[in-house]
Amino acid sequence: ILEAGTGIGKSIAYLLPSIIFALENSTPVVVSTNTINLQEQLMSKDIPDLLQVLAKAKKRLAGSELHIAQLKGRSNYICLRRWNAWRQTPGLPWEESRFLLRLLLWVNSTSSGDRAELNLNRAELDLWPRVCASEDNCVTTRCNYYPAGCFLYRARQMAQGAHLIVVNHALLLSDLAKSGSILPEYHRLVVDEAHRLEEEATDQLGYE
């Protein structure tokens, strides 16, 4: 367990050895952050910055080409089956039609299906649960979009072959609760902001 102040480069301090270990041993390392925002920061800033520095220093990492995957809970991904069924409903209110049109423009260009790309406003966030992937509404055996058109499936498949898998505490604990059925098998785990893990575990695994 290591503790350090804000802004001194903790993420770089654990990312570099994690990447090197994963490449040299051909085994995945899972990095768990407290929130999705921190996940996004690692993927969009910290990891690219680190790789850029290594490239400038001409430091070659041992092993094969580095593969990094980000994985979130299923509700972060659009379900094309639910979206398509909704947009075919006649007589939709203008707010819903506008939201579905925005999604139409997006689904033709997105490779991830991750709602983070959309920067949804409050009203759109209220509508999102009607189109997101949902365990209760997942019918893989009768879905025309599964597996090739299922963004959740594709994200999990990408994680299967990754050296570094970036998740959040909620998903990490969800995987634990489901006996490891979400994440690929791993033996090395880095927990960023570990002091938040107990609270999340209480929310995820506790009951009244």
Predicted regions and their residues:
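Signature of the SF2 helicase/ATPase Hel1-core->accessory helical subdomain module
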Residues: 4, 14, 20, 37-48, ...
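Residue-level marker of positions within ordered structural domains that often coincide
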Residues: 19-20, 76
